Amino acid sequence: MTKDIEYLTADYDNEKSSIQSVIDAIEGQDFLDVDTTMDDAVSDVSSLDEDGAISLTSSVVGPQGSKLMGYYQNELYDYASQLDSKMKEIIDTPFIEDIDKAFKGITNVKLENILIKNGGGHGRDTYGASGKIAKGDAKKSDSDVYSIDEILKSDQEFVKVIDQHYKEMKKEDKKLSKSDFEKMMTQGASCDYMTVAEAEELEEQKKKEEAIEIAALAGMVVLSCINPVAGAVAIGAYSAYSAANAATGKNIVTGRKLSKEERIMEGLSLIPLPGMGFLKGAGKSLMKLGFKGGEKFAVKTGLQKTMQQAVSRISPKMGMMKNSVLNQSRNFAQNTHVGQMLSNMRGQATHTVQQSRNWIGQQAQNVKRIVNNGLDKEIAHPFKQQLAPAGMGGIKFAETTTLRNMGQNIKRAVTPQNHVTHGPKDSMVRSEGKHSISSHEMNSSKYVESPNYTKVEFGEHYARLRPKKLKANIEYTTPTGHIYRTDHKGRIKEVYVDNLSLKDGDRNSHAQRTVGGEDRLPDDDGGHLIARMFGGSKDIDNLVAQSKFINRPFKEKGHWYNLEKEWQEFLNSGKEVKNIKMEVKYSGNSQRPTIFKVEYEINGERNIRRILNK
């Protein structure tokens, strides 16, 4: 049985967003292509300048920009390359060392040496209601002291449970005798603990004939419980952990409150039933505690089921014994050596996570500072504007500028805002005041897998937030086969449809009224990226804030509406609409798109539409 310990990852997710913000700072400013872009812009402007009134020249800037980007990439690489070693140094190693210390005091406990003393009950049963672990000079021969062997065999219900587990083990080892099994259970050692260092050494020596399966990985602590039944008693009933969990109602390592069902299971750990009582139910990922029995003694099936069934079979006297141990456990957890170690471990985990948060935050700030300083450093302007009475919108260039501003000026110079747009080289069209540009090219934009996005199941693509929000940097596929990707802020970034078809879809009026949040404009609709008539999702995983002037059939506008109707007509006429790729662009942190780029094929002919969201 394997249980995990989970570290909260929110801080690390935030740092991922911090890194992405650095990338955003230079997004669209690929200086390696600046020279080519400017040459194209000059050529396109000249082709439209019939009276020759515009003169625009530029000097080479690619090498400077390339050098800066190379420096940025090196800095980011150095930062990322240190993460693994730093995580091991400040989280994995201290945690593993504390685990080693904690187990040092509770391993190899001989069960035959554990005695239970009758604390003076009310005479209603054999053991009394205040039985506790015997200390000091208690002897097995004393009339009020009982051994584990005596307790186990005192009740026929427990004998039946033991018999059941013997039969399970017998399936794994036909030669296992009943007497050997009983001896192992009542006189064996609690468990053998192997440190990570020892496990790695053993792995190197390949002593498979002596070793129990070991996964010696960074951040993984492996326990080898030779005797699962004995381990349940020693680590469950007579260490502080499970007793304290059941008594206090929370996990003493993580502080997480236990449900009623979990407390019942923790209580069952206090009686001699097979189960691993230490550090169970502590979460998922990062640190793993693997409890694995040896090949001879492993009970591979039925343990949990048997434990659950045993609830109704606990005899009254053993139930009272269990309650007594629970009552003793609060002080035991706080005052014993093991209890103190566990408490220290919890504090150490909190401390190391805080250390890592501080270190990662500092490194991210260093990277951002280096890049921003470079982008904002003033340089002599490479562009010389001689005359711009028309076409370029009267953009003014200062004597000096920064690389950041330079990129923004270039971007403004070649966008369709001033009725001039730079599309594919074989097609240059005048927008005539419209917000939709169409062209054709041979390149296909079929879906290609990317390592930059985490694939999640449909239904797992929402973050646990209110209001509802998509997870960041993920890829999900709807039941109709439409593929979506989100950016670092959980905004829909790309949509892919292999083969469009007509299907009926539902509507979510609330989502359509609220999508876009505070960035939504009064004239916005909740627009479907893939329309309902094509089986598009009704929820925010397919909705964006979209201007009603493109989403509805307005005269001279309605570009998005017209595109959907065009697809519908093609499909109704028997034509194929395939290999759709939508790119949704945003400005800054806004949840409202600024432009949509839609590529698709009609009977093999490639089309591109760029639609401004206004």
From Swiss-Prot:
Belongs to the EssD family. Residues 417-445 are annotated as: Disordered. The active site is at H528. Pfam families: Endonuclea_NS_2, PT-TG. The gene is essD. Component of the type VII secretion system (Ess). Plays a role in Ess secretion during infection. Required for the efficient secretion of EsxA. Required for abscess formation and staphylococcal persistence in host tissues. Possesses a toxic DNase activity that is modulated by EssG by forming a nuclease toxin-antitoxin pair. This nuclease toxin targets competitor bacteria. Interacts (via C-terminal) with EssG; this interaction blocks EssD activity. Interacts with EssE. Residues 423-435 have a biased composition (Basic and acidic residues). It is found in: Secreted; Cell membrane. It comes from Staphylococcus aureus (strain NCTC 8325 / PS 47). It comes from the Bacteria. One of its GO terms (cellular component) is plasma membrane. Its main location: secreted. The keyword Coiled coil does not apply. The keyword Thylakoid does not apply. Keywords: Cell membrane, Membrane, Secreted, Virulence. This is Type VII secretion system protein EssD.
